[in-house]
Amino acid sequence: MNNMSLHQTGLKQAATITVCFLLLKTAIAADLNQTKETFSSKTTKTYSYSYLKYLPDGYDGKKEFPLLLFLHGAGERGDNLELVTKHGPPKLIKNGKKFPFIVISPQCPKGVWWKADGLDALLDGFISKHAVDRSRIYCTGLSMGGFGTWALGGLNPKRFAALAPICGGGNSIDARHIGKKPVWVFHGAKDKVIPLTESERMVNALKRRGGKPKFTIYPEAGHDSWTEAYNNPKLYEWFLSQKIK
């Protein structure tokens, strides 16, 4: 990764989710042969993500900085972090762009999709080791990463100050969980890979919950609505204006 920004480094972290299942079986005694039993089982899911880490100028591990999580699309899956620099903030950083916040850009393994619980655990681990302003954590993603942004925001809406899914979609239940959280949605009107209706459905679900999402539709854009979105400095200004109170 010699052609990568010196501030953007590749790291690997295992995100482990421990799920406890407890089954309590209570017997209604009919005779002495019926007893009360308790069964407990503990299972562990492990997700392993390589990711790019960008630390802004002035980061010294003491002063807390905002954090942006970027989720790439399906075409950048694999085990080569250079793929992650193809689009979005990692591409801009690679080309010399400086941001006033931390950026982490994980890579999804081949053949799978973003898992919200794995990403949530990744953030837990990262935040525990870095000076992060927990009131200013943001998530954005494109295509498959747009779906991941909706899913992660729905899983843990209290974590994020704002979300920006691009040409994505998802489960309207996630939109209901996100509710009034600041969200800026982007989509191309001529997208034949993920139709505009996917974002429209999620935006409408937010509105039904009292949300006031921003919704930018690029009338001439196909699936690539992310280049224009991520090249827009107003997106990052908007992110930084959002804070959990």
Question: Which role fits each region the language model picked out?
Answer:
Residues S135-G179:
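Primarily recognizes the serine-hydrolase "nucleophile elbow" in alpha/beta-hydrolase
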Residues F186, K192-K245:
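C-terminal catalytic histidine-bearing segment of alpha/beta-hydrolase fold enzymes
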Residues G58-K63, G111-S143, P157:
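Gly/Ser-rich "nucleophile elbow"/oxyanion-hole loop immediately N-terminal to the catalytic nucleophile
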Residues A27-L67, T140-L142, F147, L152, ...:
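A domain-start/cap signature at the N-terminus of enzymes
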Residues N2-A15:
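Bacterial N-terminal signal peptides that target proteins for export
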Residues L67, A74-G118:
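Active-site machinery of serine-nucleophile hydrolases
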Residues L71-H72, H187:
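The conserved beta1-alpha1 loop
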